[in-house]
Amino acid sequence: RDLRMSRGLGDVYKRQLQDDPNMDFVPQTYLFGAKAAPGYHVAKEIIQLINSLAAQIDKDPVCKDKLQVVFLENYRVSLAEKLIPASEISEQISTAGKEASGTGNMKFMMNGALTIGTLDGANVEMHQQLGDENIFLFGLTAQEVVQRKQQGYHPMDYYQQDPVLKRVIDQLSAGFDDHVSYACLLYTSPSPRDMRR
């Protein structure tokens, strides 16, 4: 989830703000709250990527008062108590059928945040109870994920055919001003256990 968000955020930063610094842009703050288990290297790399992207955006004058990224270390209940009521959008974008979820998404919704989510975990029950008009669905269903795998999933095709995606992935692979390449994250799929919310 956080890796997907980082890719999307990279697009907002590069394509929208850097390519057109004078565009009308609604100021946005992206908050990431997570905790990496000690042995999960991929999760630690994703956290480093988020912090690297945050530092790059923070020092870019084009982003001042427009875009901010904050990573909340050691995400826990006391942070959630402050974060959840302040959130306007909750992105619950795990791969459908791949992750169990708790009730965090419900807490965001009950506090007024709009939910963008896949039909996975508790989002399924929320969608059944609240209907299409109260949740913004994203991505494939669990059945569609299985079908896509059976039909053959070739991510390189998407990379080669989508110039926006290619640009973001190339940037992540090259790294930012900290000169750290995140290419290893682009060619792996983290396990749901890698990031603990």
Locations of the language-model features?
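Long, K/E/R/D-enriched contiguous segments that form extended
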Residues: R1, D11-A80
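Structural motif
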Residues: T29-Y30, L67-V70, I89, L114, ...
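Donor nucleotide-activated moiety binding/catalytic core segment of transferases
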Residues: V62-M106
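Catalytic binding pocket for nucleotide-activated donors in carbohydrate/polymer assembly enzymes
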Residues: P85-A86, I93-S189, R193
